[in-house]
Amino acid sequence: MHIAILTLTFALPGCSSLKEKRQRMGGLHARFGNTPSVAVCESGERDRHDASEWTFVIVGLSKRDIESQCSQIEEKIERTVDARIMNVEREFV
């Protein structure tokens, strides 16, 4: 069993309220949290309206599968979330 922790930090240019932030970042938990091998939560910058940090914990039988899943998560977020990814960290436990 292999475990990866994927942390993404976002900038939300022009975002003026926490309500707007929820609308722009909304759905990350619903989109990825339903996958049995992925857990997701907003892990930082919770009180700032112009930034956000989300952490994904991915488990799998091989490191290769987990790396592939991390890449898929990043690509899907780039296509679907109205925010700019500022930093990506991958850690294997």
Task: Indicate where each model-derived feature is located.
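Short arginine-rich
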Residues: 27-36
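Short, charge-patterned binding micro-sites
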Residues: 3, 41-61
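C-terminal binding/interaction regions
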Residues: 21
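C-terminal structural segments of small proteins and small subunits
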Residues: 58-93
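Short glycine-/aliphatic-rich beta-strand segments at the starts of folded cytosolic domains
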Residues: 4-13, 18
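Hydrophobic residues positioned within well-ordered beta-strands of beta-sheet architectures
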Residues: 4-8, 54, 86-88
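A short linear hydrophobic-aromatic micro-motif
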Residues: 38-43, 86-87
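Beta-strand elements of well-folded, non-transmembrane domains
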Residues: 10-14, 34, 60-62
